[in-house]
Regions:
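Catalytic pocket-lining loop regions of alpha/beta-barrel enzymes
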Residues: 125-235
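Generic structural signal for well-ordered alpha-helices
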Residues: 37-44, 70-74, 99-103, 133, ...
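Hydrophobic faces of well-ordered beta-strands that scaffold small-molecule active sites
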Residues: 7-11, 52-54, 84-89, 112-116, ...
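Short, flexible/disordered intra-domain loops and linkers
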Residues: 22-31, 61-65, 123-127, 184-190
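Active-site gating/metal-coordination segments in enzymes
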Residues: 50-51, 60-154, 201-203, 276
Length: 276
């Protein structure tokens, strides 16, 4: 585990109700979820996290839960200058009213990002989601916000799907691909060429290595060094409570070492993207 102070570019706050995921009994897999700012700050202090981008927790198929956490992240950003926040928004047409209200908060102090996912429904290719996506990116451009998209193998979160958003919107909006593709297929597609092709094409694409399979951070660091680009596009993220801070930090530190690349990913890239 790294002993340096870190900046965490993607973590969550909010305790969700138990839910019977995948047909099982109601559970709370995110067992370290935090309900209060005091609990969150205690975690930051224990970890040595100097600054953090905090986002509403999500995962249960009830959009109102995550939208309800928008006020919590705004309060966190207002009360502690170590914390910036992102607002939960949704591409689903049935959530359009709640998304519109959330986007009205984009100019509030401390708001640096918008967070969304297709895990709860919708698709990049669904025409009924297009108006919401256009609105999200219009607001992101207006307020210079970073749009965070969940990526993982399969279905609507696959990098082949989410990557279409980089192609369409990445020229003039910043996009953070959370979890670097989320699995082996996404890692290989991105590291072998796609991530670097986007950068060379002028796309404003960023990512992190949370949830990454063991080989990926090593290979990514090696390709960045070999190609000489991408060092300013990767940020450390714990994804707490769905990720594990200690594990994520140790894996990235092992891949990047204690030199310039490690410093950029653990600290400086966050400052460049989100300000001091």
């Amino acid at each position: 585990m790294t002993t340096q102070l870190t900046n965490d570019a993607h973590r969550h706050i909010g305790v969700m109700p138990a839910y019977p995921f995948y047909g099982g009994a109601p559970v709370n897999p995110d067992m370290s979820a935090r309900a209060t700012l005091a609990e969150l700050i205690a975690d930051l202090d224990r970890e040595g996290t100097e600054r953090a981008l905090v986002l509403p927790n999500y995962g249960v198929p009830d959009a109102k839960v995550s939208f309800g956490f928008n006020q919590l992240v705004l309060e966190a950003a207002a009360k502690d200058d170590r914390i910036s926040c992102g607002l939960w928004v949704s591409p689903r047409p049935q959530d359009a009213e709640m998304t519109a209200k959330a986007l009205e908060l984009a100019g509030e102090p401390g708001v640096k990002a918008l967070k969304t996912s297709f895990l709860l429904g919708g698709s990049v290719e669904d025409p009924e989601c297009q108006a919401q996506l256009d609105n999200m990116f219009a607001v992101a451009r207006e307020h210079d916000l970073v749009v965070h998209f969940h990526t993982s193998p399969g279905a609507a979160s696959d990098i082949d799907k989410v990557g279409q958003l980089v192609d369409k919107y990445g020229d003039d909006a910043k996009i953070h691909l959370v979890h670097f593709g989320g699995g082996i297929s996404g890692h290989i597609k991105l590291i072998s060429s796609r991530f670097f092709d986007w950068i060379e094409a002028g796309k404003q694409v960023y990512t992190d290595t949370s949830w990454a399979v063991g080989f990926a951070p090593r290979w990514l660091a090696s390709e960045i060094e070999r190609r000489g680009i991408g060092h300013d596009r990767v940020l450390f993220a714990s994804d707490e409570p769905w990720g594990d801070y200690a594990g994520e930090a140790a894996r990235l530190a092992a891949a990047t070492g204690d030199g310039e690349l490690g410093r950029l990913m653990f600290a400086d890239n966050f400052t460049t993207l989100y300000g001091k």
